[in-house]
Design a protein with these regions (language model features):
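Beta-strand elements within well-structured catalytic alpha/beta cores of enzymes
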Residues: 77-82, 152-153, 257-267, 271
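Domain-level recognition of soluble alpha/beta enzyme cores
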Residues: 101, 276-301
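A short, acidic, amphipathic alpha-helical segment used as a generic capping/interface helix at domain edges
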Residues: 239-255
Length: 309
């Protein structure tokens, strides 16, 4: 496979969230109170909140608007990375251990007790997704945390269900403002590393449309899963190429500054690598925010001044 070359450079803008400065080995991140936003001073506070009366999230949101002011050469987005709730594949791997899972059981569709091909949420996973919804409702009202304007999800069943349970029909008191429309978009690029593991083989297009009708499917979304192979595992480089292609798509075509992405632990680890952020391993049902900066990459001709007019 020939890897693509992005025309954008992505950088994690750190110093805003507690997980931005990870002190040791990768840790299993859970949803922190207020998503771990650090109560700090912003250069926009002088005009926006001179008396320091506004909530920390209100001041951060105003600063994000400032970063994206007209004339800025970079684009900034706040990405809420939501890992799906516990799936049956997670249960099986925990029971038998990673070595046995990787060598044998991950290649099967299930056993006599459970099915983990395109794994669905367990009862625990459903509660985790519902806890996400409760978090969003509480944080939006009490912390003034801005809700995402756009929702993206991996087409795997556990991600679709997590996203739907976390955001569909989310209600806030009238005084707290309106909830952005829930019009989620499915992105193949967000999938977990492809191949061999049946838990990462998706259902058909028809099944997704029937079971999750609110989710829009991108053009070219095939009826059958044409990306997953029974005996070939996607390389880490190919996985990273996919995630970078997702960033390219979103930063090039979606103007909203705040998005949610419901996907997989492996996908978010790749994201951390791409943006230069300390590795964050997300626990099932957790939400971790990242502030990401995108800048155009000048080609060599532009740099040496030989580009044509």
């Amino acid at each position: 496979m020939t890897l693509r070359k992005s025309k954008l450079k992505y950088t994690a803008v750190t110093g805003f969230f507690e997980h931005d400065t990870q002190p040791g080995p990768p840790f299993l991140a859970t949803t922190l109170p207020g998503l771990g936003l650090i109560d700090r001073v912003y250069e926009t506070d002088g005009k926006f909140d001179p008396q320091r009366q506004k909530a920390a999230w209100e001041r951060f949101a105003r600063y994000l608007d400032h970063l994206n002011r007209p004339g800025s050469r970079a684009v900034y987005k706040l990405l809420y990375a939501a890992r799906h709730g516990q799936g049956y594949h997670n249960v099986m791997e925990a029971e038998i251990g990673t070595v046995l899972w990787e060598s044998h059981w991950a290649k099967l569709v299930g056993n006599e007790n459970m099915t983990w091909a395109d794994a669905r949420l367990t009862a625990v996973g459903i509660r985790q997704a519902e806890d996400m919804k409760a978090f969003w409702a509480d944080a939006a009202v009490n912390l003034k945390l801005p809700l995402p304007y756009r929702h993206y999800a991996s087409p795997l069943a556990r991600c679709l269900e997590t996203c739907e349970r976390a955001f569909a029909d989310l209600k806030l008191p009238c005084a707290a403002g309106e909830v952005p429309p829930f019009e989620p978009r499915v992105k193949e690029l967000l999938r977990e590393r492809l191949g061999i593991h049946t838990c990462d083989r998706r259902h058909t297009r028809s099944w997704i449309r029937t079971n999750f009708p609110q989710f829009s499917l991108e053009p070219g979304f095939a009826e059958e899963d044409e990306l997953w192979c029974l005996d070939v595992r996607e390389t880490p480089e190919e996985h990273a190429d996919r995630v970078e292609a997702f960033l390219d798509d979103v930063f090039s075509h979606d103007v909203v500054p705040i998005i949610s992405v419901t996907a997989h632990c492996g996908t978010f680890e790749v994201l951390c690598h791409l943006i230069g952020h300390p590795t964050v391993k997300s626990a099932p049902g957790s939400i971790v925010p990242f502030l990401i900066k995108a800048e155009a990459v000048l080609d060599e001709e532009s740099v040496d001044g030989t580009a044509s007019a």
